[in-house]
Curated annotation (Swiss-Prot):
It comes from Burkholderia thailandensis (strain ATCC 700388 / DSM 13276 / CCUG 48851 / CIP 106301 / E264). Keywords: Cell inner membrane, Cell membrane, Ion transport, Membrane, Potassium, Potassium transport, Symport, Transmembrane, Transmembrane helix, Transport. The gene is kup. PANTHER family: LOW AFFINITY POTASSIUM TRANSPORT SYSTEM PROTEIN KUP, OSMOTIC STRESS POTASSIUM TRANSPORTER. Transport of potassium into the cell. Likely operates as a K(+):H(+) symporter. This is Probable potassium transport system protein Kup. It is a multi-pass membrane protein. The lineage of its organism: Bacteria, Pseudomonadati, Pseudomonadota, Betaproteobacteria, Burkholderiales.
């Protein structure tokens, strides 16, 4: 095949990935024109709809997109990939790698990363609510007589969206990219039409209008910044979804279609307001002629459902990562596609999200009321991403500290400006994502600390495995036929389940395997590096299986690899799995306060069973109880 053909294939693949990325990565930021400008000129802000104010706000929107999306995320943050994977947890794992595990900065970076992940969930409950609601509110423009159905229709759409999650979205997901391409082309065309009617709006490209607006209104303009940030909702997705599509396709989509379309639409809305300030009632839907209003409502609703789907899938992926990294208790994870390994479904997360989202929709009743709650989660995550990226630049890339200070300084000024403006909206609704984030942060840190204490207690009371096996072989118990697999969290200690089995049954299987699963700080582990097998002699084997934080442990796959390495055969239904069922008992021992220990014990009790998490046949499992005081 010629170099030209290779180049053509690569180009085709790049374009295909870019279109697919448009359907997943850019749904959130792509639907922000539905409500962003309307919220910026909310009557509560008291900003007059004068030409200078309109030009000033549009200029702020334009430069926010250019500086934060086009430069910060696309050019800088997306360089900080963890073996190709992005997102706040991947960035946290990357930033921790060169640091001393016991240093204070390590604890700070870990806490920041966890809090950033928790704020994502605060964003995840608002995005579907405000996006779908703002799209359905287009009925108030298209067919005012149906305006009373906005809330019921929104609720029905959201319930249907979460109901289909268990069946997977791989089939319809192929349509997401083309539909979102149509969406971006449509909003760009609507913008161009009105820009042609009021070309004066183009002068908003000049940052003078942004600075003039800020200096003229000062305090009010700072409040407006809290609404301007709504144009950036979903910017974090560019980085978080990098592992699915790669940096090049996302950059291509951002620069060629997404950013130009967004800018044209916002400028079009600004032009419409210059022509008719009363259009602030709903500037997005009033861009369309009356005959196109209803089709635009339909297209908007589909686009917001796609945007919501991306956030929901992101919540599943983030939960899976957090479980593997040890910050969240085990949960049942179902794979909904045999072909796409990333297509997962987490029932607990799905139904909790739906419950909270429905409460939000019913409680806030309109996208206008909900907009005040939206920006704070986004801006908090932006600040955290910037700080973690700074650590990576200095500690991992070894960049010049002065250069890093200059780059990060500019980004932090922008991020903290947006975050501070959104703190002013805590009373109007910002308390919601902050409250969700704070509650989840408490639970995740309690789980992480609790597991650390359990490991310390277990290690203190544990028996080293190597000398124990030597003694066992020197004075062997009665051997019985079959295979026994002991799952253990520490491959250097004797599993408690083995001690109980020897104590009560006084037998050892002719083939005994000690299996440990380890999660590394990279997204994926190469297949040839995943499983190591140590032969301890006399049918005893120590197996260590390493997984990345984006992978799900698979006992069956590990046994297949052991079979290949050691020329052994396994019949899953003829194999016994021995597990230790830990009962955590809160005490006044040093570690955590007693009430946090009780919370940890409750989480531990309600974690998914190992049989469900590791996909082990329940009728092949022997659970032996052990009590751990913390």
């Amino acid at each position: 095949m010629t170099d030209t053909n290779h180049s053509s294939m690569r180009q085709h693949s790049l374009q295909s990935l870019a279109i697919a990325a448009i359907g997943v990565v850019f749904g959130d930021i792509g639907t922000s024109p539905l409500y962003s400008l309307k919220e910026a000129f909310s009557p509560a802000h008291g900003i007059p709809l004068t030409p200078s104010a309109i030009l000033g706000v549009i200029s702020l929107l334009f430069w926010a997109i250019i500086l934060v999306v086009g430069i910060k995320y696309v050019l800088f943050v997306m360089r900080a990939d963890n073996n190709g994977e992005g997102g706040v947890l991947a960035l946290m794992a990357l930033s921790l790698r060169p640091l001393n595990p016991k240093s204070r900065i390590t604890g700070l970076m870990m806490a920041l990363g966890i809090f950033g992940a928790c704020m994502f969930y605060g964003d995840a409950v608002i995005t579907p609510a405000i996006s779908v609601m703002s799209a359905v509110e287009g009925l108030e423009v298209a067919t005012p007589q149906l305006s009373h159905l906005v809330l019921p229709i929104t609720i029905v759409i959201l319930i249907a969206l979460f109901w289909i999650q268990r069946h997977g979205t791989a089939t319809v997901g192929k349509l997401f990219g083309p539909i979102m391409v149509i969406w971006f082309v449509t909003i760009a065309a609507l913008g161009v039409y009105h820009i042609a009617r009021a070309p004066m709006i183009v002068s908003a490209i000049n940052p003078y209008y942004a600075f003039s607006f800020m200096s003229e209104h000062v305090l009010l303009a700072y409040v407006v910044l809290g609404s301007v940030v709504l144009v950036l909702t979903g910017a974090e997705a560019l980085y978080a979804d990098m592992g699915h599509f790669g940096a090049k396709p996302i950059r291509l989509a951002a620069y060629v279609l997404v950013m130009p379309s967004l800018v044209l639409n916002y400028f079009g809305q600004g032009a419409l307001l210059l022509l008719d300030p009363k259009a602030i009632e709903n500037p997005f839907f009033l861009l369309a002629p009356q005959w196109a209003a209803l089709p635009l409502v339909v297209l908007s609703t589909v686009a917001t459902v796609i945007a919501s789907q991306a956030v929901i899938s992101g919540a599943y992926s983030l939960t899976s990562q957090a479980i593997q990294l040890g910050y969240v208790p085990r949960m049942k994870i179902l794979h909904t596609s045999e072909l796409a390994i990333g297509q997962i479904y987490v029932p607990v997360v799905n139904w909790l999200l739906l419950f909270v989202i429905l409460c939000i929709v019913i409680g806030f009743k309109s996208s206008d009321n909900l907009a005040a709650a939206y920006g704070i989660a986004v801006t908090a995550t932006m600040v955290i991403t910037t700080i973690l990226a700074a650590v990576v630049m200095v500690k991992v890339w070894n960049w010049n500290k002065l250069l890093v200070a200059m780059i990060i300084g500019v980004f932090l000024v922008i991020d903290l400006g947006f975050f501070g403006a959104n703190l002013l909206k805590v009373e109007q609704g910002g308390w919601l994502p902050l409250g969700i984030g704070a509650l989840l942060f408490f639970l995740l840190m309690t789980w992480y600390k609790g597991r650390h204490i359990v490991k310390e207690r277990t290690a203190a009371d544990g028996i080293p495995l190597a000398p124990f096996l030597q003694g066992l072989l020197a004075h062997p118990p009665h051997r019985v036929s079959g295979t026994a697999i002991y799952l253990t969290g520490n491959d250097t200690l004797v599993p408690v389940s083995l001690l109980h089995n020897l104590k009560h049954n006084k037998v050892l299987h002719e083939r005994t395997i000690f299996m440990t699963f380890v999660t590394r700080d990279i997204p994926y582990v190469k297949d040839d590096e995943r499983v190591t097998v140590h032969d301890a002699g006399e049918g005893l084997y120590i197996v260590k299986a390493e997984y990345g934080f984006n992978e799900t442990p698979d006992v069956k796959a590990v046994l297949e690899e052991v079979s290949c390495q050691r020329a052994m055969t396994f019949e899953l239904m003829d194999t016994s799995f021995f597990l230790a069922r830990e009962t955590v008992v809160p005490t006044h021992l040093p570690g955590m306060s007693i009430w946090r220990e009780r919370v940890f014990a409750w989480m531990h009790q309600n974690a998914a069973k190992p049989t469900d998490f590791f996909a082990i046949p329940a009728n092949r499992v022997v659970e032996l109880g052990t009590k751990i005081e913390i």
